[in-house]
Curated annotation (Swiss-Prot):
Pfam families, per database record: ATP-synt_D (PF01813)
Subunit structure, interactors included: Has multiple subunits with at least A(3), B(3), C, D, E, F, H, I and proteolipid K(x).
Protein name: A-type ATP synthase subunit D
Membrane association type: Peripheral membrane protein
Function: Component of the A-type ATP synthase that produces ATP from ADP in the presence of a proton gradient across the membrane.
Family: Belongs to the V-ATPase D subunit family.
Location(s) in or outside the cell: Cell membrane
InterPro entries according to UniProt: V_ATPase_D (IPR002699)
A GO cellular component annotation in the UniProt record: plasma membrane
Disulfide bridge positions per record: none
Keywords: ATP synthesis, Cell membrane, Hydrogen ion transport, Ion transport, Membrane, Transport
């Protein structure tokens, strides 16, 4: 998008065209700056929300694992492993998207039918049973946490792209247009001066002939 003054014909038409394009680019820059500020505000707000939610989920996970290890200690490793063996395998997640400031961000939802049922024999240690049930219930929160992380990464990437565009406008594109306009104006002004001098010379010659 940058303009090389040496490759632009110094004409009035090009001067008008470049001025119009420069005005349009300045409007684009203002829009980009507004977009940058909105994204930055949203990232700041979401980052704070993410940190709060992460602490909540990690605290809950810590409690679940504490109960799990206590339950394993009570039941024995082999018996506890027999409880969780049916859960081995892959869970499936549906991924959709939503748009924030022209940025596509993910929405994760667990496919319930892919979550295997866990056998919990009567008489099992209560802490082990509770930890297994809680682990199942926290899956949605873990997906929500992953949503936060991926959304923040995409917004930060968009922020960087927006800033790069603003920098390109500020340091390359806009200056090139300004220099091209300045160059054309100087050439046109020189031509006007030359035409003025030429007309004066012609006028003097014509006056000399009439005398």
């Amino acid at each position: 998008m940058a303009v090389d003054p040496r490759k632009v014909l110094p004409t009035k038409i090009n001067l008008i065209r470049l001025r119009r394009e420069l005005a349009m680019l300045r409007r684009i820059r203002r829009v980009m700056e507004e977009k940058r500020e909105v994204i930055l505000h949203y990232i700041t707000s979401m980052a704070a929300e993410y940190v709060r939610y992460q602490r909540e989920v990690y605290s809950e996970l810590e409690r679940i694992y504490q109960n799990y290890y206590l339950g394993v200690a009570a039941e024995g490793i082999e018996r506890a492993r027999a409880f969780t063996a049916p859960a081995e395998g892959s869970l499936e997640v549906d991924v959709s998207t939503r748009t924030l400031f022209a940025v596509k961000t993910p929405v994760f939802s667990l496919r319930e039918e892919t979550v295997p049922p866990l056998p919990l024999p009567a008489g099992s240690d209560p802490k082990l049973v509770q930890s297994i049930l809680d682990m199942r219930s926290i899956l949605d929160k873990l997906l929500k946490l992953a949503e936060y992380e991926e959304t923040l990464q995409r917004l930060i990437s968009e922020l960087k792209d927006t800033q790069r565009l603003i920098n390109a406008l500020d340091y390359v594109i806009l200056p090139s247009y300004q220099n091209a306009i300045k160059f054309i104006k100087l050439v046109l002004e020189d031509r006007m001066r030359e035409d003025f001098v030429r007309l004066k010379i012609i006028k003097r010659k014509m006056e000399a002939k009439t005398q």
